[in-house]
Every structure is written in C-alpha cells, then in structure tokens.
Design a protein with these regions (language model features):
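Glycine-rich phosphate-binding loop and adjacent beta-alpha segment
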Residues: 202-235
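Residue-level marker of beta-strand positions
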Residues: 57-58, 77, 148, 216
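Glycine-rich NAD(P) Rossmann-fold beta1-alpha1 loop
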Residues: 104-105, 133-140, 200
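Adenosine-nucleotide cofactor-binding segment
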Residues: 147-203
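NAD(P)H dinucleotide-binding glycine-rich loop of Rossmann-like/cofactor-binding domains
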Residues: 62-130
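Surface-exposed amphipathic alpha-helices with a cationic face
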Residues: 139-148, 212
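N-terminal Rossmann-like NAD(P) cofactor-binding module of classical short-chain dehydrogenase/reductase
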Residues: 60, 193-196, 218
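Glycine-rich beta-strand-centered segment in the early N-terminal region that forms part
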Residues: 1-14, 26-66
Length: 235
C-alpha cells in the first residue's frame, strides 16, 4: 500500500468500446498480460491512505487509464490512486452511476459543450444537431440529452432496424450512415449547428464540411477510424 492509495470494493462496472480494444489489444493499449480490464467502476472504500476518502465512502472512477495501464473494474476489489477517484453524488446510486458510466459522462460533456455554444455566441440558438454512432452508448445518451435541451436531433446509423429505438430516444430524423461514408466535399451545404461524433474517419470529415459557420463539433470517438482527412476550409 503506497501513500495516497485507496482500496475499493467494486459494486458495478460498465462495458465500453475501449474495453473491447483492450481485450483484442489491436491498439496496443496493454503492455503485458494477465490484465484486468474495465475502464470505470463504482464501489465503497474498504481501506484508505488518503485524507480525502474514508472507510465506507461511495466512489466512482472513469477513464484515467484505469483498465488500461492500471488494473480495472472487472474485479472484486481495486487499489487505485486517490487522485483518480471522486465521491459519488448522493442523488445517484452506485448502480445507476455505472448504467451511465463512461459513455454517459462522455455524452454529457459533448452535450454541454454544444449548449455552451449558445452562450459563447451571445445567445444565438442551436437548432439542428447531428449525432453519429447513434445506437452506441455515447450516441444514445447524447440523443436523449440533446432532445431534452430542445434541439432538432438527427441520428446517423447503419442499423435500419433501430429507427424506432432512436425515435424513442428523441431523434427527429434518421440518416443512413452510408450518406456520410462518401468522399467528403471541401465545403458542403451547412446543415448542422452542432455535431456529436463518436465515429471519426470519413464520417467526421463529412460532418465537418456540413457544419454551419460558427457551429461546434464535439468529436469523442474513433469507432471507424483514427484518421481524419479534411482541410482548413470549413474552419
């Protein structure tokens, strides 16, 4: 036990895209095996060498390379550096904290960034928002939050059988992913005040070219590709 370490009894952990990458190790995220994945978890403090956390505290950790270079949440107990932990708000249970998990945290950051655009541009209203990778965790929660903000949300998916699901979440329009997998124009027609992109690659390049002047893009994923072929023209 090192100075500042905290031992946590894990209650819940979520399953994320990065966990799949870690299991495959195609992205070379793990240096050696055996390894315990799980990039987030919630639980109770069982032992603490930190003045910030005491026995019985409910805590949450997300990302911070947990489950990557540090042992992850798919375990009964985890020893973690205290600076990576946050105390769980009392308004949410440990279970619900991980139902939202890293995907929920990420989608909220994206949604709040788009909402903040209205304040940055002196109240100019955001209307049309595009969400790619819409049936994934980040995309699904982003649709719910953005629609609650009153935005006209367009969801991008390659799964035609998920149209009803996306409409229930709050999407007003559905776009076939293939429409954004074509060679992007340098400057397309301005369609979007905001974009939440979880895909990357050519889909993000097309979303950039279709974003209105003064628009905002929250790019948070690379499910399709880490590469981005674009120009300075849309900026």
């Amino acid at each position: 036990f090192k100075s500042g370490d905290v031992l946590v009894k894990v209650d819940y952990s979520s399953l994320n895209y990065k966990d799949a990458l870690i299991l495959k190790n195609g992205a070379k995220l793990v240096k050696e095996y055996p390894h315990i994945p799980g990039i987030d978890f919630s639980g109770q403090v069982k032992e603490s060498d930190s003045s910030d956390f005491k026995l019985g505290d409910d805590v949450v950790v997300t990302s911070c390379r947990i489950g990557e270079i540090y042992p992850g949440g798919y375990s009964q107990v985890v020893k973690v550096k205290s600076e990576l932990l946050v105390k769980k708000p009392k308004l949410i249970s440990n279970k619900n904290a991980m139902i939202l998990g890293t995907a929920g945290f990420t989608s909220l950051l994206c949604a709040f960034a788009i909402k903040a655009r209205e304040e940055l541009l002196l109240g100019e209203k955001v209307n049309d928002v595009l969400v790619t990778g819409a049936t994934g965790g980040v995309g699904s929660i982003a649709i719910m939050v953005l629609s609650k903000f009153g935005y006209n949300v367009t969801a991008v998916t390659g799964k035609k059988n998920k149209t009803g699901y996306l409409k229930e979440l709050g999407a007003k329009n559905i776009v076939d992913r293939k429409e954004l997998e074509v060679e992007p124009r340098v400057l397309g027609k301005g369609l979007w005040d905001g974009v939440v992109d979880t895909v990357g690659g050519v889909v993000l390049a097309n979303a950039i070219s279709q974003t209105k002047h003064g628009g905002i893009i929250a790019a948070c994923g690379n499910a399709a590709s880490i590469k981005l072929n674009t120009t300075v023209m849309p900026f």
